[in-house]
Amino acid sequence: MTPELNWLSDPTVFAVNRLDAHSDHVCYRTMQEAAQRHSSLRQPLDGMWRFVWSSCPAQRPADFWREGADLSGFGTIRVPGHMETQGYGQLQYTNTLYPWDGRSALRPPQVDLNDDPVGSYAREFDLDAGLRGQRVCISFQGVEQAMYLWCNGKFVGYAEDSFTPSEFDLTPYIKETGNRICVEVYKRSSAAWIEDQDFFRFSGMFRPVYLYAKPAVHLADIWLKAGLSEDNTTGLLTPELKLDGETEGVSVTLRLTDPEGYALYEGPVTGDTIELEGIQPWSHKTPVLYHAELTLKDAQGTVQEVVPYDIGFRRFEMKDGIMCLNGERVVFNGVNRHEWNPEKGRAIDADDMNAAMAVLKANNINAVRTCHYPDQSLWYDLCDKNGIYMIDETNLESHGSWQKLGAIEPSWNVPGSLPEWKDCVVDRARSMLERDKNHAAVLIWSCGNESYAGEDILAMTQFFHAKDPSRLVHYEGVVHNRAFAAITDMESRMYAKPWEIREYLESKPEKPFILCEYMHDMGNSLGGMESYVKLAEEYPQYQGGFIWDYMDQAIWHTDVMGRKVLGYGGDFGERTTDYNFSGNGIVYADGAEKPAMQDVRYWYASPADRAAQDAVNAAAAAQADRTLAEAWQSRRAYPLVVTQGDDNLGVKGKNFEMLFSIAGAGPASLKVNGTEWLWRAPRPAFWRASTDNDRGCGFPLRAAAWMAADVFVTYNGMKVLEAGPDCVKVQFQFGIPTVPGASAELVYTVEAQGALRVDAVYHGVAGAPELPCFGVKFETFGPVTRTVWTGLSGETYPDRYKGGVFGCHEETPHVEPHLVPQDCGMHMQTRQAMLEQQDACGHTTAALTLQQVDAPFAFSALPNTAQEIEAAQHITELPATGRTSVMVLGAVRGVGGIDSWGTDVEEPYHVSGEEDHSVSFRIVL
């Protein structure tokens, strides 16, 4: 057969000579190999390959695959890996728009061959001893996006589908020594129209590549159908096997052992169902796996292969419109997870997966959706072992073919109901199911993501139902085309508002409801999660959701200033792009948890555990209130010394002195034990830096006057209300240049007990825009190196604080490394905060303590002002000023989280400009 370049633009050509998809089992030659998990029947081809990158097919080395071709001009590339992360081609992130939008006028299934980069790979090898004399196949676990394969100068095959294995038989072409494999990988093909996921657009062999041998008889496919009877103690095991090769007279035996190693069954595989008593059901709380070992013998009784596989017995079904696992309603406390590493992109390894699993386990996450493609097989093993429920999603997304600038316009949607696309999308469903069918963790098959709806996706569902009735089928896209409601077994939506979900659940629906995506965690987000979790406690048919998403997608690179920074869309010179819209993780790109994670952990805990934490917090807060009140009441008073100057009113007390400046509109100096704390006089605070969610809903535009007011407030004068040895009280009045205008005042009371009380008041006015916040702000003269506070742990906001644990906490002032800097570091319900300066050895040299007066306050201490943060596009752009910006607030806007492109924060977490706001606190001197 002669390979054709026009296959790239033909959706009916997606697999040429590709072997049938099969289960992800590993064959070992002996029981000893199986015990050691090292197979002599496999030979990895990972490592350095010869490589040439070409900008288009016309520029590629067209004959490099010929036997004896001179490859001396080739460079090298690492496999697994993407071309783009290794310096070949253009890094590009885009969400909905196709990468060629505005550059090539294309319609499905066209490909612009003048803009289709090609990677030419070559690898030379000798066969390992364990593979010689047998049939030899090659497995590409993931190649993006289309590949042609040659072996020793002979064309072998062609394949698409970036995220499931493509395997080929090399037996007619392979030699014991001196082999050369050649692969052409094309970045774009007709598959690009249905692989339009919201991610960086890569190409290359980014998952492992290996050879495997088939003995004379081979276990080509296994399906260990592990069910559970209604009594939840009787397991039902039906092995279905496919043998390949010389099958006459062969035998297969099965040995099944429990977690303690006791044999539950040992005997021949006949195709009959095996009943097993005393089985422990598999679930999130009890992820019990049983070890199956299949032994294949030839007609002479010689062991040909041994296949181990861990299986879980469980029963997943729809009962009265509710999804049930082992007879009990299941609630998905889930997250969407892209495969990601900030150095290697989607070419992740076991360390990445183990780290992600540890995060899921530590934060009460019980489910994961493989958005929007099947993951590496190891991830499924980890989910089996750790009881993580899975929605396994087909590699299908085509939102660029029907979403046009926010409008639904499916005139050239693919796959739709187009017959030429049907086989390729059903093949993608088949490849996923066949590989992953043995995994207990997979409860639901998903037809893909955001691809509208039509006959072709319906055919995928029909395949899933016919092939595997033990699982349900998911697809969200029918919400846009209800004519194909039969595609999905459940009502699935993205970013629906709580009231919209409630409306559905009140309608007595036939199908249960899940959110396949919710809580869009872009930047500083995840506010209002309570509104969703509470639905699960009220409505049995609300069965949870999957946060968007697990990890920020960003890539380490060196910027134009020579600084190493996590780059996002546009940082690499690419257009079109969606900039930082890939930064939606509950962990950063380097795997560190974002501050919002404590609320994920709280809301994904059981109601009983949440109630217990609430009770502990309430008791600890009450004790802190009593302790602080008693400490204040026991403080001794010392006479104040007041000095009236021309511009300044000076006040001295025990261990402190300060100057109130008429011209400076506030305290110009505050010294405690000789240390100056104020860079400039405090001012009313009206602005916190915009978050991604703020920008998405247009809040900065609506509230822009407050940004100006935060910098250009009008000083209307100083009044000395009291000045004596027991008390000095000074008022500063400010006019606010909003439309309509408003006013605020700061009142400072120096108390003889050694404290400066600060009272800030904002006077609301009808028609004033919403505020980002209100309180007091000041910059310290020198840097604060540590803050210690009594209040809730971590970063908290009005709509995201329940996960905080009340106690004494500390941190180094810092700006959170969101892809785009934004407001961060807020601490709600604070009773006391201590700002510390330290020497090089970490010893505290000075400290300033802020305490509540009548009620707790919110505070933040950051190395940059709100304006500096607002102006930066990367954390490396923030200036180092040597100061710390402190805000003490009585009102602060929530961060929101329903989505990041239009929905405002929930109403209770707005700060009205028409209402009065105030905050009071003491600076203990």
Briefly describe each language-model feature range.
Residues E84-Q86, Q92-T94, G142, K187, ...:
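Beta-strand/loop-rich accessory regions of lumenal/periplasmic or secreted enzymes
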Residues R207-W223, F313-R329, D625-S634, T785-T790:
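Low-complexity, Pro/Ser/Thr- and charge-rich linker/hinge segments at domain boundaries
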Residues T2-L19, A35-Q36, R50-S54, F74, ...:
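Accessory beta-strand-rich segments of carbohydrate-active enzymes
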Residues A216-G245, P595, D599-N617, A629-D647, ...:
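Surface beta-strand/loop "capping" patches
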Residues P172-G178, E240-K319:
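Extended acidic/polar, glycine-enriched regions
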